[in-house]
Amino acid sequence: MYSARRRGQQMHNPWFWHRTVVTRWLPMMALPLLTSVPAAWPQPEPALPPLSSEQVVQHLMEKNLERAAALQHYVGKRSYRLEYHGFPASAEATMEVEVNYDAPASKHFTIVSATGSKLIQTRVFHRLLETEEQAGDASNRKQTELGSENYTFSLAGTEGPNYVLNVEPKVESKFLYRGKIWVDGHDFAVTRIEAQPAKSPSFWTTKSMIHHTYQRVDNEFYLPKENKTITSVRLGGTATLTIEYQSYQVTAAKPLALARKPVPSAVGFAWPDGGSNQEVANFMSSRR
């Protein structure tokens, strides 16, 4: 009777439950977990081949040309947002845009909706679209291409599946940048950019930081995912321009193997939305 009553008391004793679970049941419960843990651990990524910066850039140029020659048409959506906080007053605006791309470098934009500051819409967003439409011209592309004619490259190291390269412009131009690029070690495509303009686009801006990321589309093409530019204003204030790229649909493309071409002196890859810093600077100057 005593032992039964004692067992009943133990059943309602939190410490008894704690001791019983910890000493008896947890080891048994943990056994199947422990035996399955090694299979669940993430496997280390294979080390990248030890390539020089020249070799990485050469592969990048070749693959960019293949992808550019293969990509014939796509559609997509973009969300533009600019937030300015500072002197003389804060302002913000957004715009939703649809884009149609046709090879080799033609883009057509349709504005779906817009909210906020009319000044930002006209002085920044509209001009960004106009600049990008004009960027398809061969002479304009040549000024901004990420290649040996415009940049000097050096290997900074590796990070996961990417080679990391330092990029230095050969001339001080507001259309060129200095910073780092991340190049996928398998596809040899730019996946990320962290940089700043080689030359300030305006007296009114003191510093701009550019953050670009890219996404793989249809397992073959690398297209922009997000573009964020943070600009500091000389008289106080910060402007943050964010462009998000969504809903890509590649509607026409050639097989990459059939798109191979000889490598020219410059790679077929330009910094996306290269006029963003200039248009933000124009907006700043209009508020003085």
Where are the language model's segments positioned?
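Beta-strand-dense domains in secreted/periplasmic systems and polymorphic toxin scaffolds
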Residues: 193, 225-229
